[in-house]
Amino acid sequence: MGGIVLTPAAQADVDEIWDYTLERWGLEQAETYTRQLWKNIETLAEHPSLGKECSEVRPGYRQYPSGSHILFYRLIPNGIDVVRILHERMDYQRHFP
């Protein structure tokens, strides 16, 4: 498997997704949802070209759906750098520096 790097913003996104899902739907769903999120991240590390290029967001970025969220990442030597994990209804441009 390729390496996985999460930016601090992406880690904060994971934490927020966990907290929201726990509060809204309970522990079991929070565990299930975040486990699937991590499985998708691991799949992308193994097969980084699965995601669709999204240069309109930022040059070099790719995106991949995971449940109601979109994983935004870029390729790095030996793996992927997960930049953000945003809800599909969010205005993506607002969340990138």
Predicted regions and their residues:
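Short proline/glycine- and basic residue-enriched helix-capping loop/turn segments at helix->loop/beta transitions
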Residues: 42-46
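Basic/aromatic recognition patch in beta-strand/loop cores that engages polyanionic ligands
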Residues: 49-78
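Enriched for short, Lys/Arg-rich terminal
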Residues: 69-70, 74-97
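Short, hydrophobic secondary-structure boundary micro-motifs
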Residues: 30, 52-54, 94
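Arg/Lys-rich, positively charged N-terminal/basic patches that mediate binding to nucleic acids
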Residues: 1-34
